[in-house]
Regions:
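Short beta-strand-to-coil "C-cap" segments at the C-terminal boundary of structured domains/repeats
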Residues: 269-276
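Acidic/histidine-rich helix-loop elements
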Residues: 35-44
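A short N-terminal beta-strand-loop micro-motif at the entrance of redox/enzyme domains
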Residues: 48-53
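Functional-site microenvironments in short loops/helix caps that host divalent-cation chemistry
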Residues: 27-29, 33-35, 76, 82-254, ...
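Bacterial Sec-dependent N-terminal signal peptides
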Residues: 1-24
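Short capping motifs at secondary-structure boundaries
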Residues: 54, 61, 67-78, 139-140
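Short Gly/aromatic-enriched secondary-structure transition segments
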Residues: 44-46, 68-72, 82-83
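Terminal peptide-recognition signature
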Residues: 56, 62, 66, 132, ...
Length: 278
């Protein structure tokens, strides 16, 4: 009897996940003026910006969602074609990644470290910006702009973090590297790499994993005339620690090659109007 209850509960959860309406999966952000940036920041100075209303996903795009895209289109990612994905393993020096020809979204850290079979609710990684563009085209959505992402992340705050001025509470809201550096493996929060989306507490607007878990691609340029091969990502990832890659905040902006695939890189979608369910 207990087993039957568990199975019934699982079916209900799966149905709710699949049938969730766009209104449940997205947060509406009203048009208006917003304060973004940080005083003295070279690439993102404090300023007031206007944005039109938009919608942004509550969660980062998952392996399950990306798998549906691949199943429908037979799409082959950059990492699968080029065999040049970059993955991380504990014990390497700071900012040192290794190329793994076996790594792609189904095996985000390489075949030797296992696949995503039991991680369908984790964010998809080891994909390029180009791959994400193709997904968005299929799904009828888009990436948030740099400004939209920050407005959604801040959730009305003007401090460095949506929960205050200091990062003391980061472990409540984000899957980040809690060790002092990367020479020692750290999974004290239960996750060495990615965690299920929505596992940590949301920001005040109900958006999950705005900090940590995976870097999130954004559209737009930091400066005029920027090379088209360079794109941007925000929010930090599971790899970011207090000592290095301290990007789990509301103001920093990362930069990466458009065709590069990293095991800590993912995305969250947005839309100008409420999208149809795919």
């Amino acid at each position: 009897m207990d087993f039957q209850r568990k199975i019934s509960g699982l079916v209900i959860i799966l149905l709710l996940s699949v049938l969730a309406s766009p209104a449940q999966r997205f947060v509406a952000v009203p048009a208006g003026h917003y304060i973004i940036g940080k005083k003295g920041h070279l690439n993102n100075p404090r300023r007031k910006v206007w944005v039109d209303s938009f919608y942004i996903a509550r969660f980062e795009t998952t392996n399950r969602e990306f798998a549906a895209f691949v199943a429908a289109t037979s799409y082959v990612t950059d990492a699968e074609r080029k065999h040049d994905a970059l993955v991380f393993q504990p014990g390497l020096r700071e900012f040192e990644w290794i190329e793994d020809s076996t790594a792609y979204w189904r095996y985000p850290n390489g075949i030797s470290r296992g696949g995503i079979e039991n991680k369908m609710d984790h964010p998809v990684t080891t994909i390029s910006y180009h791959d994400v563009e193709e997904y968005c085209r299929w799904a009828g959505v888009r990436l948030p702009t740099l400004e939209e992402w920050e407005i959604a992340c801040r959730a009305g705050s003007t401090t460095d973090y949506f929960f205050g001025k200091r990062d003391d509470s980061i472990s409540r809201y984000a899957n980040v590297w809690l060790g002092w550096d990367h020479t020692v493996a750290d999974s004290s929060d239960g996750y060495m790499y990615t965690s299920p989306v929505g596992h940590f507490a949301p920001n005040p607007w109900g958006l999950y994993d705005m900090y940590g878990n995976v870097f999130e691609f954004c559209s737009g340029a930091v400066v005029q005339g920027e090379k088209e091969t360079l794109v941007h990502a925000r929010g930090g990832s599971w790899w970011c620690s207090a000592r290095s890659c301290h990007f789990f905040n509301s103001f920093d902006i990362g930069r990466v090659h458009k065709r590069a695939s990293f095991s800590n890189q993912g995305f969250r979608v947005a839309a100008s109007s409420l999208p149809n369910r795919k």
